[in-house]
Amino acid sequence: MRFRRLSIRYRELGPGATLRLFGDPWILPLPIRMARPEWRPPVDYRESDGELAVKIEVAGMTEEQFEILLYQDVLVIEGDRPWRSSGAEARFHLAEIRYGPFRLELPIPGDIDRERVTARYEQGFLTVHLPKANPT
């Protein structure tokens, strides 16, 4: 599991991108239109007096397949759940499990103690604990 602390502000849409509340949804800057398809796994994001905690359901992965990026005001979690074929040719009657790259972008309200951030992947769940710098 790769974990990086970054001291720059996060730019969600990238350079040159504009966010419009109204207007033609098909007219977007080229880098956004050409982005690879990503999915978003189920997530619980909770806050207590002393910390923020994120729990993500992503079974079938290893710690090395996650990248956790901690920006000044956003936590970004990326990964790539690989497709594991059974080897036999088959037709699907139902296919609800998502595979491939995923990305979560979660805002961080307030200051956190970056030296005490921890992450653990266990039994199909990735849990990230973000202790508050000044707990209330």
Spans of features found by a protein language model:
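Surface-exposed coil/turn segments at beta-strand junctions on protein surfaces, enriched
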Residues: 47, 97-99, 112, 121
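Structural motif
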Residues: 48-50, 71, 122
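An anionic, turn-rich surface loop/hairpin at beta-sheet edges
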Residues: 81-105
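Short, well-ordered beta-strand segments enriched in hydrophobic/aromatic residues
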Residues: 52-58, 127-130
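Beta-rich strand-turn-strand
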Residues: 62-67, 107-136
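N-terminal leader/pre-domain low-complexity segments
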Residues: 1-53, 78, 83-87
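Core FKBP-type peptidyl-prolyl cis-trans isomerase
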Residues: 62-90
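Short coil/loop residues immediately preceding or within conserved phosphate-binding loops
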Residues: 40, 103, 114
